[in-house]
């Protein structure tokens, strides 16, 4: 089973051994279509919608707030309507997939933890990457060379232990951290 979640943020448990935890809000979703163990679901995200979304809402008899669609693995879901959240109460471990924080175009020191050059004593080699190849052979830059470039905004999946799930407020508490900023949307699935 897969579920759509929004990251609330991080906190910690208040006991003898303080444990860092991540709080995730499980999004309410409506199952519109079931096919081969996969479900097309609609969920609420932002207020924006257009004529194409309006047509989908009319087709599946959805209210205006359900304006985004996603395909989830839903092997236990048998009928259309609200997505069944009963599986979350018994989960022990989940795989959480989120996009990392985007850092734009970053240099080699930030992106790859290069040491950099001397800061003073007449040096003019501070944050540069340095040499990127050999000599006449191979006469080109090797594939996979660590260089400056776009950093972050990549999909990252990690396994976390489930500490608790509050059905009323639909908040899932995971041990440890997950990628992304507070407020980021992602997915969780049972391991």
From Swiss-Prot:
Pfam families: Ribosomal_L3 (PF00297). Disulfide bonds: none annotated. One of its GO terms (molecular function) is structural constituent of ribosome. One of its GO terms (cellular component) is cytosolic large ribosomal subunit. Keywords: Ribonucleoprotein, Ribosomal protein, RNA-binding, rRNA-binding. It comes from the Bacteria. Residues 119-138 are annotated as: Disordered. GO terms for biological process: translation. Part of the 50S ribosomal subunit. Forms a cluster with proteins L14 and L19. PANTHER family: 50S RIBOSOMAL PROTEIN L3, LARGE RIBOSOMAL SUBUNIT PROTEIN UL3C. Belongs to the universal ribosomal protein uL3 family. One of the primary rRNA binding proteins, it binds directly near the 3'-end of the 23S rRNA, where it nucleates assembly of the 50S subunit. This is Large ribosomal subunit protein uL3. It comes from Helicobacter pylori (strain J99 / ATCC 700824) (Campylobacter pylori J99).
């Amino acid at each position: 089973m897969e579920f759509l979640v929004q990251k609330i943020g991080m906190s910690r448990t208040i006991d003898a051994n303080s444990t860092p935890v991540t709080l995730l809000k499980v999004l309410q979703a409506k199952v519109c279509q079931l096919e081969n163990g996969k479900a097309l679901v609609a969920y609420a995200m932002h207020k924006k919608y257009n004529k194409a979304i309006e047509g989908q809402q009319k087709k599946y008899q959805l209210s205006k707030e359900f304006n985004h669609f996603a395909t989830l693995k839903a092997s236990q879901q048998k009928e259309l309507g609200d997505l069944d959240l009963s599986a979350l109460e018994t989960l022990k471990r989940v795989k959480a997939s989120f996009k990392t924080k985007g850092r734009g175009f970053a240099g080699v020191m930030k992106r790859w933890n290069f040491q950099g050059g001397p800061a003073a004593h007449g040096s003019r080699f501070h944050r540069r990457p340095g040499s990127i190849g050999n000599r006449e052979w191979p006469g080109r830059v090797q594939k996979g060379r660590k260089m400056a470039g776009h950093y972050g905004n990549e999909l990252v999946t990690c396994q976390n232990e489930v500490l608790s799930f509050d059905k009323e407020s639909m908040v899932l508490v995971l041990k440890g951290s997950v990628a992304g900023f507070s407020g980021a949307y992602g997915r969780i699935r049972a391991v």
